[in-house]
Amino acid sequence: MFERILLAVDGSEHSRKAVPVAGDLSRRYGGEVIVLHVREHEVTWGADIDVETADEARELVDGVVRELKDSGANVRGEVMRVALGQTPRAILDLARDEGVGLIVMGTRGLSDWGRLLMGSVAHKIVHLAEVPVLVVR
């Protein structure tokens, strides 16, 4: 059913909850999980400032990949570096380029505010994705 599943992670508690869900779907349907973490950077006054280091990002992805492999999932990891605010576009572009059938991601808990039901990245992905999106909270 899902030959490729894109698991977008950011290291938060909310995204951690999506990891076992993606692993279960991979094992159940025999699909590959692509673990993606997007590193943002900002250019300010001529300086290029990373929100996190490349090593921190790689460590995050490698940890999730190990966890999913240990649970029997077929998995690989990707780290992308984009300009601040471009994370949704990077996720959607990779999903398209890889022929992903499902995007899995976490979000913060629900609130009473209509547009704030999901984190802004999850909100944009849900509304712009061309494939199903499973949001785990």
Residue ranges of model-derived segments:
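Short, hinge-like loop/turn segments at secondary-structure boundaries
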Residues: D50-A54, L94-R96, V121-A122
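Structural beta-alpha unit
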Residues: K69-I103
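Short, acidic/small-residue loops that bind anionic groups at enzyme active sites
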Residues: L128-R137
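Small/aliphatic-rich secondary-structure junction motif
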Residues: E3-V51, K69-G77
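Glycine-rich, Arg-bearing micro-motifs that act as flexible, cationic patches
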Residues: L102-H127
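Residue-level detector of structured alpha->beta connecting loops
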Residues: G30, G99-G101, E130
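Short secondary-structure boundary segments
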Residues: H37-V38, G106-R108, R137
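Acidic, proline/glycine-rich short linear motifs
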Residues: L36-G63, Q86, A90
